[in-house]
Amino acid sequence: MRFTSTILLRVAVLLSLGGGSQTTSCTPGQPFPIPAYSKTSLQQTFEQIFETVSRSFDNESFHSTNVAIEVTSSQETLWSFYHAAKNQSSQDGSTVIGPDTVFRVARVSKLLTAIAILQLHDQGHISSLYDPINIYIPDLDPSTVQWGRITIWDLLNNVAGILDMYGYADIYTDFSARQRADLNLPPVPEDSLEGMPACQVDKSIPCDSAGLLSWLRSSRAVFEPHRINSNSNVGFSLLGILIERITGIDYERFISQTLIEPLHLNSTSFRPPHKNSGAVLQNDHTWNWDVGVNNPSVGLYSTPRDISTLLRWTLNESPSSLLNWFAPGFYAVGSHSLIGMPWNIFRTTAPLSIPNRPTTFNTVVGTLGPYTSVVVVMPEYDLAVSLMMNGALGHPHDILAKVTFPLVRAADKIALEKVRDNYAGTYKAEPRQKINSSITLSVSPDHGLYISELISNGSSILPVMERLASSKSGGGSNWIFQAVPTFLETKRRRTPHDRVVVNEEWRWTYVLDKPPGEGWNDWCLSSFDPVTYAGEPLTKMVFQKDAKSGRVLSVALSGYNITLPKGVQEAGIFAQLEGTSLDLHAQAGQEVLAG
């Protein structure tokens, strides 16, 4: 029996209530499974990046600069670029730059601290990330700072509203008299220096936790807690003290035992190696500077090889089974920036130049003296980039764009081609099913995989649903029914023909093809489960794939209670799949919404 208009109207009403009128700027992200790369799949892109980056570093302003860039997937390092300073007299360390050259990696140190905190929380040593920090460090009080309102989560996300740095970054102690004079700052009486930390006045004295806590008790807040994002290296120093209080182990030893050694980061430490193995500038005192209690935020020394190993771990693992480490926790400055633990998250449509397809970059960036380090993680593409430099750089916007933008474009093309080859096509009922039903899935750069045709028992469903959904939404007729992976796999079953089948779940949603950026068109409400039929989700599709080859064999439409083989299959493919289809609530061959 065919769909009746009453049934279609009810479905359309439920869809419009469940998800709202979504415009193309609300197209779901991650329109493909996580891609994989071969040794050659990105080769042409890397050749282009090499030429572009090489030209940049040929500039005279970089003649006294050492540079190391690596790109890795979750499986292996895919590409590297090393640039040694042409002016070798500017260097006091190694004049050959490679994967094992040691750099000071500044705020990239925060990655290890954040991982350690999240693991301790996962293991139950920290009861809640929303615990106030003064529960664990009571000697922060008494203070004018509201430590009872500042949580571990606030410190991880840099929204505690507290001071940024301790023991450095003070113009009086870190600038020369000439530089201070150029700023026309007033003279400072000698007795006013008595309140400054001893480790700031004399850099040969490492800053310690007792001095930090004493200094914080007399400090004042920068902002009200969890009101606005403002970087705080001091916050990560407190997280380092928290680790020590919980574990009874020195921060540096704990990080070494739980992360550096298990991950075989053999050239990573909190102590400077011999300068002959490092990227060290002539007359630079930062290389050997012991930052003490600031180690959790800026103290680490590491190599491109080790950082790529760490980034591979972040792509493969999560420090927490309870949360998505890459997800944002708070707003940052600007319309494209968010904050995470400890990420600075940048979302932009610039790489793909498609208004509804933003790319998310999880970054950590920082400098310490002449050393600059950046890591960029792109989880949806299974890629990460590290950049380490000593010498001239400024903010690394330009170099990052030259590396990441063409990389994202190439990775996106690979991912969509994989979707087209594996999932796109027509899935049609076999004659033995005795029903005229099919679904056609297509691929576009804007929307990834989408339903371009749906036939139920001889009736074309999408045009009717588009019209009815439009009448309920108040405008627009060009609806796109986009499918996205859920990253859920259901049962693996072995068929009578000894074929192992994987059931891979996807969901589809609908967006209205209106231009973004007009009025409230960018206001997005998301639901991938807006309506069910007899308890089965209408928007659920389950692809049945051969576990060995990865080839898609069929798709099961849960709400319609039917499994449709893909395209031209070998004889009897549906019979081979019997016993592997989903346990739906009606017999195979019946469509639930057909009567």
From Swiss-Prot:
Its EC number is 3.5.-.-. Keywords: Glycoprotein, Hydrolase, Signal. It is an enzyme of class 3 (hydrolase). Residues 1-23 form the signal peptide. Glycans are attached at N59, N87, N266, N436, N457, N561. Gene3D superfamilies: DD-peptidase/beta-lactamase superfamily (3.40.710.10). Pfam families: Beta-lactamase. GO terms for molecular function: hydrolase activity. InterPro entries: Beta-lactam-related (IPR001466), Beta-lactam/transpept-like (IPR012338), Beta-lactamase-like_AB/R (IPR051478). Pathway: Secondary metabolite biosynthesis. Induction: Expression is induced on squalestatin S1-producing YMG medium. Probable hydrolase; part of the gene cluster that mediates the biosynthesis of squalestatin S1 (SQS1, also known as zaragozic acid A), a heavily oxidized fungal polyketide that offers potent cholesterol lowering activity by targeting squalene synthase (SS). SQS1 is composed of a 2,8-dioxobicyclic[3.2.1]octane-3,4,5-tricarboxyclic acid core that is connected to two lipophilic polyketide arms. Belongs to the beta-lactamase family. This is Probable hydrolase M10. It comes from Phoma sp. (strain ATCC 20986 / MF5453).
